[in-house]
């Protein structure tokens, strides 16, 4: 398979009419959500949902690329593949997650998907690395074996962060069916050591207004406020990624919303994930899930004929203005890619 991938990559790069030059694309085959964005040992690491065998979503792996500037990326070997009993469901695999560093070790958190007696189960798991290139799955996976009581098995996309000496994890979940009549939730967990987690409550609840499932949640602090983002399934708004700004009581798991809005006015900005760059800025990258990637629109889009499908947004620096609007601008190195300027006026 490795030789076949190399041949496909050469064809895709040399003959690709649609191959992106401005946005990150997979070397070959299908990609979607960005995962595990982190600056570690002098390099930016970009992981992403990846199916190395097809231009269609299936059997999720974690693709991997590294960069010195978040613009020019070098493809690396696949970081995670579904090879354990708890993550080997053929229509699942190693779903989305995040990365943190602790004592020089890189921790990857991901959702493992398997099937038991015909029922799909989603659990939260760990893989670690001391060099950022080779990863070992934790022998006692999964570290969170089931969703909170009353939740469905749609329980995925852990985002881990540190606050006041403790580790926290937000995970997307729902009451009912994520596909049809569910009510989305963002769950909060707490840990002292990254291995043992305690459920604290829900940061955000849909209550019939914010979709049936809150995929790819994120939570980070900006200017003394806490920003919560997610990509709700079946949300009535056409724009697919939302943000909230407010205050957070971690001890009692009470999030008070002061502002809410769309993260992007387009329809192709899904599963955004944030991380801190080497200068301390908060940066976001998202999957550009334009409709041409989807099977019901021109099969899988013209890029599938070139052996690849999917791309990511350029990295965006995130800030809050005085009215707590979430403001984004391309990171500074993007300017080097612009060779011609065009100005539009109202």
Pin down the residues of each PLM region:
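A generic local secondary-structure boundary/capping motif
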Residues: 159, 272-273
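Beta-rich carbohydrate-recognition and catalytic domains
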Residues: 1-157, 161-209, 221-266, 286-345
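Active-site metal-binding loops of divalent metal-dependent hydrolases
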Residues: 217
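Repeat-based blade/solenoid architectures
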Residues: 210-214, 266-271
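Structured ligand/cofactor/substrate-binding pocket environments in proteins
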Residues: 274, 280-283, 305-307
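Active-site lining segments that contact anionic ligands and/or coordinate catalytic metals
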Residues: 269-271, 279-281, 315
């Amino acid at each position: 398979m490795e030789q076949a991938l190399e041949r496909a990559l050469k064809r895709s790069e040399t003959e690709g009419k649609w191959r992106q030059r401005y946005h990150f694309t997979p070397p070959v085959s299908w990609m979607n959500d960005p995962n595990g964005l982190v600056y570690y040992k002098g390099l930016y690491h970009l992981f992403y949902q990846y199916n190395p065998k097809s231009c269609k979503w299936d059997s999720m792996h974690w693709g991997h690329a590294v960069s010195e500037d978040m613009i020019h990326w070098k493809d690396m070997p696949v970081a995670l593949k579904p090879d354990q009993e708890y993550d080997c469901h053929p229509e699942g695999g190693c779903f989305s997650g995040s990365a943190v560093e602790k004592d020089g070790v890189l921790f990857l958190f991901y959702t493992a998907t398997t099937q038991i007696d015909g029922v799909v189960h989603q659990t939260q798991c760990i893989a670690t690395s001391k060099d950022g290139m080779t990863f070992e799955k934790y022998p006692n996976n999964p570290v969170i074996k089931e969703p909170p009581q009353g939740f469905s098995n749609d329980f995925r996309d852990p985002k881990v962060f540190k606050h006041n000496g403790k580790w926290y994890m937000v995970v997307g979940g729902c009451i009912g069916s994520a596909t049809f009549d569910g009510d989305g939730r963002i769950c909060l967990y707490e840990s002292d050591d990254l291995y043992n987690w305690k459920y604290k409550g829900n940061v955000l609840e849909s209550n019939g207004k914010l979709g049936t499932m809150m995929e790819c949640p994120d939570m980070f602090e900006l200017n003394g406020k806490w920003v919560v983002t997610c990509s709700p399934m079946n949300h009535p708004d056409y724009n697919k990624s939302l943000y909230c700004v407010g205050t957070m009581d971690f001890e009692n798991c009470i999030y008070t919303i002061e502002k809410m809005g769309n993260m992007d006015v387009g329809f192709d900005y899904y599963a955004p994930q944030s991380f801190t760059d080497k200068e301390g800025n908060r940066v976001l990258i998202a999957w550009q899930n334009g409709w041409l990637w989807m099977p019901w629109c021109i099969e899988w889009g013209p890029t599938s004929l070139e052996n690849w499908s999917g791309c990511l947004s350029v990295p965006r620096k995130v800030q809050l203005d005085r009215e707590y609007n979430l403001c984004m601008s391309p990171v500074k190195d993007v300017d080097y890619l612009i060779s011609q300027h065009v100005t539009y006026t109202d």
